[in-house]
Amino acid sequence: MGPKRIPLVAGNWKMNFDHLEATYFVQQLAWNLRAIHFDYKRCEIALMPSFTSLRSVQVAVESDNLKIRYGAQAVSVTSQGAFTGDVSADMIAHLGCSYVIVGHSERRKYHPEDDANIVDQVRAVLAAGMQPILCVGESYEERRKGIELDFAVGQVHDVTRDLSDEEAAKLIVAYEPVWAIGTGMVATPQSAQDAARAIRNDLSDTFGTRVGETVRILYGGSVSSKNAVELINEPDVDGFLIGGSALKVDELTRICKLTLETTA
């Protein structure tokens, strides 16, 4: 964790929780964090619900003046019109969202989304005043070939190379090795650090050291309270994008607490 970067713990709920379950989870998480006197100024917490729960999460957060932030899991590259099923960045921003996940491996695989589309998503999110969380990471096959760092860095470079310095500085990168997502397998702290450092170096080479040292780089892939401390202790890991553990409110509370304590 870098000395000038505020850690971020983001929970990606994927296709889980209806709007009532989402509301209850937000209230319970806020209660848990209040009970331990959580300092949101030193560690940001964000939840990424499904589109159908965004409004409910907004109401829960705003009605109780909670410090928890939230965002969307996907976004359209178009602003409006005859695009059935799409949701624009402006629509998401009007619900008070701070972040939007772009380029997640599940979106790349099942929809599919390519780098050109992801570049447009990043620009749409930035234009709407939110921060994109750009997901990158290698498959097991790429790791077996020993090209995992080149692959992850290449994904970042292909998406960011045409951004301005100002746009790039607002980016958040989530390194999520595909083989670790939902498998119980987790990258070693050194592997996570190596990837984060390589990504940061590429950003510094492209946009200058100021931008490279400003961008927060998260780790994702079977994060739990058992491995959070050793991961966040790495100098270039600035937080987490969490899947399964973010569906369990007590476990997510523990990860938030450990992240804050370790980076204090």
From Swiss-Prot:
Keyword annotations: Cytoplasm, Gluconeogenesis, Glycolysis, Isomerase
Coiled-coil stretches noted in the UniProt entry, renumbered to this chain: none
Record localization: Cytoplasm
Family as reported in the entry's similarity comment: Belongs to the triosephosphate isomerase family.
Source species, domain of life: Bacteria
SUPFAM superfamilies found in the cross-reference section: Triosephosphate isomerase (TIM) (SSF51351)
Function as written in the Swiss-Prot or TrEMBL entry: Involved in the gluconeogenesis. Catalyzes stereospecifically the conversion of dihydroxyacetone phosphate (DHAP) to D-glyceraldehyde-3-phosphate (G3P).
Assembly mode: Homodimer.
Gene3D superfamilies from the UniProt entry: Aldolase class I
Keyword Cytoplasm on entry: yes
Species of origin: Bifidobacterium adolescentis (strain ATCC 15703 / DSM 20083 / NCTC 11814 / E194a)
Alphabetical list of NCBIfam families matching this protein: tim
Protein name per its UniProtKB record: Triosephosphate isomerase
Binding site for substrate: 12-14, 182, 222, 243-244
Active site positions: 104, 176
Coarse class of the protein's main subcellular location: cytoplasm
GO biological process: gluconeogenesis; glyceraldehyde-3-phosphate biosynthetic process; glycerol catabolic process; glycolytic process
Pathway: Carbohydrate biosynthesis; gluconeogenesis; Carbohydrate degradation; glycolysis; D-glyceraldehyde 3-phosphate from glycerone phosphate: step 1/1
HAMAP family, sorted: TIM_B
EC numbers for this chain: 5.3.1.1
GO molecular-function terms, A-Z: triose-phosphate isomerase activity
Catalytic activity field: D-glyceraldehyde 3-phosphate = dihydroxyacetone phosphate
High-level lineage: Bacteria, Bacillati, Actinomycetota, Actinomycetes, Bifidobacteriales
Gene that encodes the chain: tpiA
A cellular-component GO term for this protein: cytosol
